[in-house]
Amino acid sequence: EGPYIRRDGETNPANFIAHRKSMIRLSELIGTLVSAYLLTGEEKYARPAVRHLRAWFVEDDTKMRPSLLYGQAIKGKYTGRSIGIIDTLHLVEVARGAKLLKDSPSFITVDQQAVRAWFSEYLNWINTHEYGLKEKVHPNNHGVCWSLQAAAFADLTGNEEIIDWIRAQFKSVYLPVMMDEQGGFPAELKRTKPYGYSLFMIDVMAGVAQIVSTKDEDLWQFVTPNGSEMKKGM
């Protein structure tokens, strides 16, 4: 009955993951349905996507609260932790889908506004609550995952200030500090699953680069003074 002990790379087999599984399922559904809509232009794919968006972010009886106070709790020790914010990484796909669905007649204006308002509120929470502020500057993949989420949510809601911060963080911290001259990630290579964590890290960094790059500031082509760049990481 005592508090659980943290062991890197291991999870508690009795932990509650139903909500996380639901979020993963949502990201898969939105990604698939919105892709089908964009390829075919058929509303039969947009309509169910909108139903899921309404259930999660609009309807008072079913929508998720725009906060993560109880993420990655540890029995007997913590009711929630800052690193739990990484679990909403699956909402990146959802935010991207909501943006791409904007021209669908099925996604009426009032619903679009409600979805954007939800993501704006959650973005504000991860950028002001102590959990979010700690995760924002976390020195490994958690910090980059914060930025990927914030980038997707800011892109959907039009928050250029956040996007500018992430772009600067990518150029001043993620590449020159988290990546070495050979394209490796020292903090991830020290862990129990170095290969998997390294692949995850470059995947998340690629997502950040894709969202916040501009014609004038292409993070895919950016090279640090010490020679770190996305090409080496890939």
What are these regions (language model features)?
Residues 24, 28-31, 44, 51, ...:
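Short, well-structured alpha-helical interface segments that form or flank functional binding sites
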Residues 148, 152-234:
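Long, repeat-rich segments with strong aromatic
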Residues 82, 86, 90, 111-118, ...:
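Short, contiguous, pocket-lining structural segments
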